[in-house]
Amino acid sequence: MKSILPLLLFLSIFSIYGQTTTVEYWLQARMNGVYELENGSSVQFWGYGDNTPPNPGNKVFLPGPQLRFKVEDSAVVHFKNNSPEMHTIHFHGLDVNQANDGVGHTSQDIAPNQTFDYRFKCTNEGTFLYHCHVLTTLHLAMGMYGTVVVGPSNGSSSLSTGLPNYDSEYLMLSSEFDLDWNTNPISPGPFHLFEANYSMINGLSGTQLQNGDHDILGNVNSFIAIRLANIGYGRTKFDFPSNLTVVAYLSDGRLLPSPIQASSFDLYPGERFDLLVSSDQIIDDLVAVSYYDLRNDNQTGSNFVPIKIGNNALTSIDANGLQFWPNPVQGVLYCNNPSNQSVLFQVYALDGKLIQEGNIQPGLNTLQLELLAGMYMMKTPQSLLKFIFD
């Protein structure tokens, strides 16, 4: 999957008692975003972008930058309104006081070219949302939203303290456009009826999700964390392959009384589920996402996200007869290709970001990998293998 834009700067302040950590982000609002549709045409959108000093950008993203904290962190979100209209940031599901709730008339609207610092303490693990709460019907529909992830206070790769660690993590944020609104937004109104006609996962739709950059990748007998969230106006149904074990541990930023194992999950507007997904077999399949109108339950769209579970032993021979060694890798990875055809290889980080790619020629190959130390996925047309780079 395409990585969610990381913000570049945070400040950690440890008190003399060793407890308090302040994590800061800088966001801006703009109303000049250009979104490329699946068919190659473009529409306008409004959104949030990185505003980190000393060199803030001038772009907004769909969805907005993901904000990540740990339980007990003191969060500070510095917000600048670089647009001609009022905007706010409302932190949906997070426990914040009224002054920091981002609901205009009960806290404050942020005027054009003005700033505001949102401050709150992170008290619960889970997945949360943020969005503009000025003329919410329009501003949210135009793309002014993003996600917040709060992890365990100990920094572990788990959904919550005491749960198993996961090897990789993915977000599946559902949303929709009514393209008529994006073509001709009217503020403050009147509005015509919102009719969802363009469905997205993480701001992408249709074939945009099928190019290999947005696959959910994992290994046999390992856990994948999948964070489901719905910021749209309809019901979204996520259907997972039946040979996956899918267990929900958190809902709306709270631990469930008992974990829920299921192959499908229905999410209503603003709802979130945090899942651990695993399998004891190799899988190359799709997560089907269906979108429904809340008024009449008519289906308004669908998307499909590839999910691939592979072997975790890099020294094994894959379906093409390729053999890789050694594991861990120290600079050079060797590969023997017994066929007379070249084979594409791709190296992914565990968050799904494509790091390096090339071709494996017939015979013995020496692959020079330019990576930071850590764990990676090697993808070929017929396999998905995990390796460690020292």
Label every model-predicted segment.
Residues 79-83, 228-232, 335-337:
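Asparagine-centered strand-capping/turn motif at beta-strand->loop junctions
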Residues 25, 29-150, 235-265, 285-300:
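Histidine- and aromatic-enriched segments that form or immediately flank copper-ligand environments
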Residues 309-325, 331, 338:
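Residue-level detector of functionally pivotal "anchor" positions at catalytic/ligand-binding pockets or at interdomain
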Residues 347-355, 376:
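Short, glycine-anchored, charge-dense loop/turn motifs used at functional sites
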